[in-house]
C-alpha cells in the first residue's frame, strides 16, 4: 500500500514540474536563421520583367528608371519593414435571468364514499430559476517594427511575406512572427507597410524562458483541472 502511494506521489511531483529540462539552468536558444520562413514555390508559372536592353544611340536608358522611383520590395528575397501598431480595446457584458413557476391541482370526487376511499385530490408545484452573468474586458497595446522577406509572388502581383524576430533579454526570449499577403501599391516610398494593410495577416508575439514558465501553471495542476469534476 505504501509503495502504491509512493509511486503516485512521485508521479505527481514529476508531472508538476513546470520547467523545460532543455533550458534548465541555461538561457533559451535562438532558432536557426530562415528556419520558419516556410518558402514554397508557387505551382503557377511566374513571369518577371526582362532585363533592360542596351541602347547605344539614345540619350535615355531604361536602366535609369531606378533613379526615378523609390526602392520597394517586389521580388522574392526582397526585404521590407512592417509597422505593427495595435491598440485595441473591447468590452462585452451579457446578463440573463430566467424564472418559471407552475402549479396544478386535481380533485376527484364522485358524491359517494366507500370507506372514505373514493374521493381524492392531487396537487403539484414546480419552480425553475436560472441566472447568468458574463463580462469580458480586453485591452491590447503593441507597437513594434519587424523586417519581413518576400517569399513568393502571386500571379496577380501580390506579395507573400514572412518575417521573424527574436530578442533575448537575460533568461527570457521574446519571439515575433508575422506573415501575410500585401499589395505592392500599399508599400510606402520608404519600403514600409502598415500591419492593417496585410491580408490574411498572422501575427504572433510571445516568448519562452523563466518568466513564461512562471506564468504557466505546473503540468500537474493543469492535469487536475482537466480531470477534476469540480
From Swiss-Prot:
Main location: membrane
Lipid attachment site numbers (N-palmitoyl cysteine): 17
Lipid addition sites, S-diacylglycerol cysteine: 17
Signal peptide stretch: 1-16
Protein name according to UniProt: Flagellar L-ring protein
Localization (cell): Cell outer membrane; Bacterial flagellum basal body
Matching PANTHER family: FLAGELLAR L-RING PROTEIN (PTHR34933:SF1)
HAMAP family on file: FlgH
Protein keywords: Bacterial flagellum, Cell outer membrane, Lipoprotein, Membrane, Palmitate, Signal
Family: Belongs to the FlgH family.
NCBIfam families: PRK00249.1-5
